[in-house]
């Protein structure tokens, strides 16, 4: 059963056509019904395996098909990941997201992934991963390890999708979201503005997300970061008001979801970001880099928070800074079965 009434494309189109200030007012009212408007959830994103991805996503510098100057890197060592998580927590993040440039993880990678989830969770941080497509077994193993969120974006509308990606179908993305949900992991899924899509495509993306059996708990809205060497490097800039409008419509359609102001913040001024928060955005990525693209420095974000009277949201998780953390960190690098496989060692 759907948690909310199903939306139609005509209803979503009507929202996009509303006068902007009226739309912002409606979005802010809905936002205040479900969230503290002064609280912003703060996440940090780390690339645990960079580049050499076999996919052909036209926006992505990590694709092996494009010459962007990005050098491929092997999987990070477990302790490197945990050290980055500690730094993220000390900087104020409450959720640590880990991404790998894969079409999908291999079975041999699963023990490594399970261990870093357990290690990060033991620090009292929420955990999130984006690893490509998952099968049922992989989703359940990550759930059993304690993974809180799994990110798998739809990127755009079903109609425009084939113009951007051909190596993975839209239905495969939806199937992964279903497997994640069935495993008991919270869903993080959103899209990108600036791919060359129309307003109808933006409406179609949000329609897909909002009409999932349960809408995503987290909805990242990205502004395209144009990277030289990718097919979309010369795309037109996104109008700030169009981006703000997309945030507002997402908030109205998914009132209880966290709407994340995601990639592209480095190219937004403070006024644009402030209007995004007014439109209902209540989550950001914090730190100087999102996988391989720039993000505002931590001190700039703190200054903006002070100017706007915003505060990082505090999150409690079941595992915290206690003896469990010490025990896990002592055993993380010690194989306990003959089948132990350390993906980082390859």
UniProtKB/Swiss-Prot annotation:
Belongs to the radical SAM superfamily. Biotin synthase family. Catalyzes the conversion of dethiobiotin (DTB) to biotin by the insertion of a sulfur atom into dethiobiotin via a radical-based mechanism. Pathway: Cofactor biosynthesis; biotin biosynthesis; biotin from 7,8-diaminononanoate: step 2/2. It holds the Pfam family BATS. It catalyses: (4R,5S)-dethiobiotin + (sulfur carrier)-SH + 2 reduced [2Fe-2S]-[ferredoxin] + 2 S-adenosyl-L-methionine = (sulfur carrier)-H + biotin + 2 5'-deoxyadenosine + 2 L-methionine + 2 oxidized [2Fe-2S]-[ferredoxin]. Binds 1 [4Fe-4S] cluster. The cluster is coordinated with 3 cysteines and an exchangeable S-adenosyl-L-methionine. Binds 1 [2Fe-2S] cluster. The cluster is coordinated with 3 cysteines and 1 arginine. Residues 38-256 form the Radical SAM core domain. This is Biotin synthase. Coiled coil: none annotated. The gene is bioB. It comes from the Bacteria. InterPro entries: Aldolase_TIM, BATS_dom, Biotin_synth/BioAB, Biotin_synthase, Elp3/MiaA/NifB-like_rSAM, rSAM. [4Fe-4S] cluster binds at residues 53, 57, 60. Its EC number is 2.8.1.6. Homodimer. Keywords: 2Fe-2S, 4Fe-4S, Biotin biosynthesis, Iron, Iron-sulfur, Metal-binding, S-adenosyl-L-methionine, Transferase. Its cofactor is [4Fe-4S] cluster; [2Fe-2S] cluster.
